[in-house]
Amino acid sequence: MKRLLGMLTIILGLCGVVLAQGSLLINGAGATFPYPIYSKWFDEFGKANGTHINYQSVGSGAGIKQVTEGTVDFGASDGPMNDDQIKAYQAKNGTGILHFPTVLGADVPTYNIPGVSTSLNFTPEALAGIFLGRISKWNDPAIAGANQGVNLPANDIVVIHRSDGSGTTYIWTDYLSKISSDWKDKVGKGTSVSWPVGLGGKGNEGVAGLLKQTPNSIGYVELIYAAQNKITYGAVKNAAGNFVKADLAGVSAAAAGAAKTMPDDFRVSITNAPGKNAYPISSFTWLLLPEKFKDGTKRDAMKNFVKWAITDGQNDVEALSYAKLPKEVVDKELKALGKVM
């Protein structure tokens, strides 16, 4: 019996060696915003290259934390790491961290108002007022004034926000900080903030779920989550004074200016961008790669993945409600991949 068990142990061990040699495992964690496209990409790339990329959709804040602590090989975030976070990463890991934009997306104001199925218009002032808790009724003049002919109820507004560290929150609060000095001074921007009002949901999925089950609620999710969950979302008044509902053209228009002046570290904000057709709550989302990998095989695989994702992989993005990267950004990234050692 012992001999049989010993033989089984050897056989299973050999099987493990074969599996290990046939497939490379890379671990990553971070943003939920791009998870639908990342899931598709990692599956496609893995099948073609024998690389299994295990990605945890845990939120940008957790992704930054995990990549800094070295518990994953790469991170992902919808908000670029700030200077303090980069310094903390360098101190912990003895190398730098690089940002690589992968796609463009949009945060949208989503709501669940019984009896109202039309797409509402939201001014910047109305959104800031709602999330500050100063506008508390759906028929408030700040909302009704931009939605003539819509019978809005006198019901209390229930604000829903993210409860976890979130790049989607970073985009939303970055926008609110640009259009409202009160928001900037009292709340500010970040992957996590001290919310003045509201209920918290974990992940884009959690916010979408809360919205669907909470009458008279308003929240924010990435565009694909609104579409997948069949949640109504509204148009937002942009910097040019036009109400724009999020779509691929509007997101691309928001990125047009930044594409020509992209900084070398790719850390840029495109919320409240100029342009008559620009959707104002748009953003790049980034993969976070160590400047120097400890494992050369993983380094080569991730460099190949990024190269594929920002070129051939862009053919997949529009079907999932993301916008393609501008050519100027792709060209700059391909050169920047040389910094990954």
Q: What function would you assign to each model-found segment?
A:
Residues L14-A20:
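Sec/Tat signal peptide C-region and signal peptidase I cleavage site
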